[in-house]
Amino acid sequence: MTSSVSRPSGRRADELRKVALTRHYTKHAEGSVLVEFGDTKVLCTASVAERVPEFLRERGQGWLTAEYGMLPRATHTRSDREAARGKQTGRTQEIQRLIGRALRAVFDLEALGPRTLHIDCDVIQADGGTRTASITGAFVAAHDAVSTLIAAGKLTRSPITDHVAAISVGVYEGAPVLDLDYAEDSRCDTDMNVVMTGAGGFVEVQGTAEGVPFSRAEMNALLDLAQGGIAELVQLQKDVLGASHA
């Protein structure tokens, strides 16, 4: 591995894109956030339903589930809406399950009570890292939805146990880099998505060699990069939530 690399964006190997989290982006959902990782923009909403899936009836606990989708022109060329095709792609199903798992990792579902938190992540513009941006933004939307429940007297305490955020890392031109945009993601040798809690626990690691297999040393370097990047994202979440932080 090389110690430095020339990235298309001009960023350092360990530098995130400009990240922004805009709360209360829409007025109807209990929680809504526009998350921006550079040119990737995702609208994340959290909606509360006072019911649970059939498999959780009579258990006295809640549930959190997620859906993910991309607008037809979120990418360079237009894609048909999945609804028009009559089914979701495997990629869509994989990503929305990942988002749900990531958020459930930091929720006490018993404390949530017999209700469901529906997370919707809609990609407005894609430039790499849509799933990691979705997780990072969805946490803030979920936090705001919980705050709404507390303010309404439906919860006495927050069921959120920690922060959760996600980032992509990869081996690009022989060097480990943080937060890949599309130009890097489409040409990298290794692509990895990492989900971690604020306390530093790993929720999920998805890593794939796109051509050249990666070594244990490269994997360790990628995880170190991801850990540093996620720490920055968690701090941003805390800064954005401010006094309302649970």
Swiss-Prot record:
Its EC number is 2.7.7.56. It comes from the Bacteria. InterPro entries: ExoRNase_PH_dom1, ExoRNase_PH_dom2, ExoRNase_PH_dom2_sf, PNPase/RNase_PH_dom_sf, Ribosomal_Su5_D2-typ_SF, RNase_PH, RNase_PH_bac-type, RNase_PH_CS. It is an enzyme of class 2 (transferase). GO terms for biological process: rRNA catabolic process; rRNA processing; tRNA processing. Keywords: Nucleotidyltransferase, RNA-binding, rRNA processing, Transferase, tRNA processing, tRNA-binding. GO terms for molecular function: 3'-5'-RNA exonuclease activity; tRNA binding; tRNA nucleotidyltransferase activity. It catalyses: tRNA(n+1) + phosphate = tRNA(n) + a ribonucleoside 5'-diphosphate. Phosphate binds at residues 91, 129-131. It holds the Pfam family RNase_PH. Belongs to the RNase PH family. Phosphorolytic 3'-5' exoribonuclease that plays an important role in tRNA 3'-end maturation. Removes nucleotide residues following the 3'-CCA terminus of tRNAs; can also add nucleotides to the ends of RNA molecules by using nucleoside diphosphates as substrates, but this may not be physiologically important. Probably plays a role in initiation of 16S rRNA degradation (leading to ribosome degradation) during starvation. This is Ribonuclease PH. It comes from Burkholderia cenocepacia (strain ATCC BAA-245 / DSM 16553 / LMG 16656 / NCTC 13227 / J2315 / CF5610) (Burkholderia cepacia (strain J2315)).
